[in-house]
Amino acid sequence: MAVLTLDYRCCDRKRPLYIKHIEVERIAATARQQLVADSIDAVSFDALRQISGLKINGIDFALEVSTDYAVHDEQGNHVFGVCEFDPAMPDAAMVSISPVGESLSELLALSTLAHELGHAVFDAPGWVVQGSKGPGLFDDIEPTMQRAYRTTTPDSEHLSKALSAKPTTEEHF
């Protein structure tokens, strides 16, 4: 089980701070170096699936990866994958990818898993920090609702570089 350790420029809420494409490429190269030897041509689906934890900008959290079950959005539509944070599990992010089948080829599954791991690297640290905050000095002691987060990859168009692709939406529950 692999734990990726990565750092990038971020704000005090642990969200990326003006990261350029070249910096994302450097971060991806650092992740690749931690997952496979230089002699390996490509990172495999299994290597990505075995990532069990992330340490991003000093924030440690577990990563649960599921590739066994079909994934659906809130409306019940089949989607390729999601990256989620549930405040009931404050030290973990979850990545779920629909299994290879009619609508998802092996290559699309690999691309979707890498894409959702990108959300785990760049979005989840902020979610974990936000989820760990308790009430402030002047807040009510009564339990308050905590926010869950989800990013969704609905289809292959979302993974394309085309300008027509819809941007990722972050959903709050």
Q: Where are these predicted regions, by residue range?
A:
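Polar/charged alpha-helical tracts
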Residues: 26-29, 46, 87-88, 139, ...
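Short helix-to-loop capping/linker segments positioned immediately adjacent to catalytic or ligand/cofactor-binding
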Residues: 35-37, 101, 108, 162-165
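Active-site scaffold of zinc-dependent metalloenzymes
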Residues: 61-113, 117-138
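Post-HEXXH active-site segment of zinc metalloproteases
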Residues: 111, 122-166, 172
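A generic helix-loop boundary/linker signal
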Residues: 18-21, 164, 168
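Generic hydrophobic secondary-structure packing signal
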Residues: 24-27, 110, 170-173
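A metal-dependent hydrolase signature that marks the N-terminal structural subdomain at the beginning
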Residues: 1-84
